[in-house]
Amino acid sequence: MLKNQVSIIIAVYRDVVALDLILKALKNQTYKKFEVIIAEDGQSEEMKEFIDTVNDLTIKHLSQEDIGWRKNKMLNKAIIESSCDYLIFIDGDCVPHEKFIEEHYNRRKNNFVLCGRRTEPGEKFSTLLREGKISIDMFFTSYLKNYFHLKKDEIRHYEEGIYCKQNSILEKLITIKSSRKEAHIVGCNWSCNKEDILKINGFDEDFELPTTGEDTDIERRMRHFGIKMISCRNFAIMTHLHHKKNFNHYTKQLLPQPSEAQK
């Protein structure tokens, strides 16, 4: 039996359909020696029931009470539970290309963080993926051919979904271009050695609202310890699934509510 070398940590919240697509994509990865840690910032019965049905993957499912945005706390638990020396972090609404893990693992270096990005198709293509009318493999293999359809669908960051093969001319061109532009952590797609993130004591759990700088914070602290950022854009690629962004659920739990007299 192959010994796992990589822990894939997936931060999830309620979106079972997206997780299903992610796990299907993980089953089709070219690199096989990995475990999956599902870090659920909540305790959805639907999520648990679905995960219990999944076969052919080594999965650890961690959850916690749904009392506000506590993603960082959940990620710290996942780091502790991981059994591998190399960690890849992805979000639960982002589906990886079949070579995603292979690219992260083969490009790893000591004292470096690999920083990737994501492409963001609009509602039409995201719905096709969610409904199973196209697979993630079909999405990426026809990516260039569907350029105009994707643009019509108001895709964002189209260039981030172009996969670059190893040792190709395109790889050399992109590597040169990437070296001119400093890499930064985006929480949906990055990886590091486990010892490096333990060195900085993991994620700061004082961040209790999304998009408030938790990615920037962990990058800043890693740089302080001499850990450098390197780009894996166009090598470890993934696509985001379109959804409405609504943070009211979290702000209502954090902000004091007006009394009856104040209403």
Predicted regions and their residues:
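Cell-envelope/extracellular polymer assembly enzymes that use nucleotide-activated donors
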Residues: 5-7, 35, 217
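Short, acidic, metal-binding catalytic loop of nucleotide-sugar glycosyltransferases
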Residues: 24-33
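A conserved acidic beta->alpha catalytic loop
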Residues: 32, 40-49, 94
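Glycine-rich, basic loop-to-helix element that forms the pyrophosphate-binding segment
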Residues: 65-82, 99
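Short aromatic/hydrophobic "clamp" motif used to bind/position activated sugar donors
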Residues: 87
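Conserved donor NDP-sugar-binding/catalytic core segment of glycosyltransferases
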Residues: 99-153
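Short, flexible, basic/aromatic active-site loop/helix in glycosyltransferases
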Residues: 135-182
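A short, conserved alpha-helix in the catalytic core of glycosyltransferases
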Residues: 184-192, 196-201, 208-227
